[in-house]
A protein has these predicted regions:
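Core nucleotide-handling region used for phosphoryl-transfer chemistry
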Residues: 7-321
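A signal for long, low-complexity, Ser/Thr/Asn-enriched, surface-exposed stalk/shaft
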Residues: 1-4
Length: 321
């Protein structure tokens, strides 16, 4: 009953032009249920309070029941009087092909493919502007992590990045990057520290802005490469299945209601190298390592919802940890 009432509340209050964008009060409500995977972390910068939101080990049902698709790295900056200065979006949660009901092949095969981009293998990055005009780079949940420090360093030393970021913040657009560096290796190697532009989002409506409409502003900033034109999902699946030395692709489609819908296609090469679908995921020491390294969400994302036994086993270990 509590969840049903919450869903009614969300449906009445969150939807903005097709995107469910939480206000601060609504984000707090998502965290208040005792079974909620969502949580808030608070910090302070130059006397301004900041709240980050995220989720711990959320399953598909949590995103559906709470409408929590926007809670990953959602950030609020407050004025000194306690009022909200601005809310900063990140990327909404999306899934792998065939991972959850909404990303099943039988559903998305009928969607129009708009763009296919290379999936970079680093850490998500964005920027926040404070009431005093200060701009800081951030990782998903921090201004102080090694990744956040690197993100801010690129902003301060790369004039093209700074120019683009400043323009987006002045126009209430969120520029979302992938931070890659030799010292930030996940699986793939990157030879230098840089920010690769992934997306531009309207910070008020959540709408994804076509990068190709703003190439003059993007300038020489590196963009996650656009793949060849793909109109046929079957062909794209065949191509990705044969690729090596890359993580995969992000597919941006248009659903039957005209709304942007994203899903991921990972290469078998990357999955095998990352050990995501090997027997290792059933070994307690391996699972504990993923939990401690904050990689378990990626692991869970590779296990289909139908693999109930695997999910249950991992969840039991998570609760112990």
């Amino acid at each position: 009953m509590k969840v049903l009432k919450y869903i009614e509340f969300v449906n009445e209050n969150l939807e903005v032009k097709g995107y469910r964008l939480p206000t601060y009060d609504q984000a707090i409500k998502m965290c208040s249920d005792e079974d909620s995977p969502f949580y808030e972390i608070k910090t302070e910068v130059d006397g301004y309070n900041v709240s980050f939101f995220n989720y711990r080990l959320a399953q598909y049902k949590d995103f559906v029941n709470y409408n929590g698709y926007e809670m990953r790295g959602l950030t609020f900056v407050f004025n000194t009087d306690g009022s909200v200065f601005n809310r900063y979006l990140l990327l909404e949660k999306f899934f792998n092909l065939n991972q959850v009901p909404e990303s099943m092949y039988s559903i998305v095969k009928n969607y129009k493919i708009k763009y296919v981009n290379n999936k970079e293998d680093g850490s998500i990055a964005s920027f926040v502007k404070f009431p005093n005009g200060k701009v800081l780079g951030k990782s998903k949940m921090s201004f102080e992590s090694d990744q956040a420090i690197g993100i801010d360093r690129v902003y301060k030393t790369n004039s093209d990045i700074k120019k683009l970021v400043d323009w987006t913040l002045d126009n209430d657009i969120v520029a979302i990057f992938e931070y890659v560096a030799p010292q930030n290796r996940i699986v793939l190697r990157y030879s230098k520290e840089e920010l690769i532009l992934l997306r531009l989002r309207d910070n008020k409506t959540g709408k994804h802005i076509d990068l190709k409409d703003h190439l003059d502003k993007i300038g020489s900033v590196k963009i996650a490469p656009f793949e060849d034109e793909y109109n046929d999902l079957d062909h794209l699946i065949e191509v990705v299945a044969k690729q090596e030395d890359k993580e995969g692709v992000i597919v941006q489609t248009e659903d039957v209601n005209g709304r942007d819908f994203f899903f991921k296609l990972k290469t078998p090469w990357y999955v095998a190298l990352h050990g995501l679908l090997t027997d290792d995921i059933y070994k307690e020491n391996i699972i504990i390592g993923y939990i401690l390294d904050d990689k378990i969400d990626d692991i869970l994302g590779q296990i289909p919802e139908t693999e109930v036994e695997a999910h249950d086993r991992i969840e039991k270990i998570i609760k112990i940890i």
